[in-house]
Amino acid sequence: MNPDIDDTTAALRALRSQSRLDKATAGAWKRGLDWLLSMQNDDGGWPAFEKNTDSPLISSLPIEGADTVSTDPSSADLTGRTLEFLGRYAGYKENDAPVQKAVRWLLARQEIDGSWYGRWGIAYLYGTWAALTGLMAVGVSPAHPAVQKAVDWLTRQQNADGGWGESCHSDEQKMYAPLGASTPSQTAWALDALIAVHPRPTPAIERGIDYLSRQSQAADWTTAYPTGGGRPGGTYFAYHSYRWIWPLLALSHYQSKYASAS
């Protein structure tokens, strides 16, 4: 098994500033970037671990969960997050060949309602966040019909308290299922996507910011609800850092983007 695509982009993000200061880090950063680009699937998307392992023969093996654990196809979340890295940290834009292929792959896999399914997080909120932030990072216009359709979908899913929440049932039934309550991580994903698209804060964004601010000290079940994906219908993960990491990132993006615009 190869290293993890998502973890590689996370490490490269952390190394980017230092890579401009010393040759050793610059060399490591370049090797990581080259490996990341080499892992792009032939269809244009990115997998989690293994390149071009989406054979229908493998997924039909008489093994429980073979359709999800025996293959590693391109996914909207990995493709979107890789695009976000390439655009924000590596200077890649819409006319670069790897980006063109990935954007085409993403646009072709948008759901009819405007969302994207995310494989490694729950689920349509996660995938839509990754797709939108990736598309914005490489220069796709916020006015693109696919972007606007996704924004409309996200806005419709916002709860009365200003947050967002999606059930793990979405992952199993491959159809958006509201949780009935908001979670910090899923709110942060939706909010971060809207921030990436809009040049100025919208009412939906402000309501989401207010929710995160109110919930920063919450300690109920919504802060521990599993929002990490594993095997659909079988395994889900509650990452304890998610309630802090994703809200902090969304809040920092809100501050850095809109403070100068106000």
Write out the residue ranges for each language-model feature.
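Preference for long, amphipathic alpha-helical scaffolds in soluble/luminal domains
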Residues: 1-262
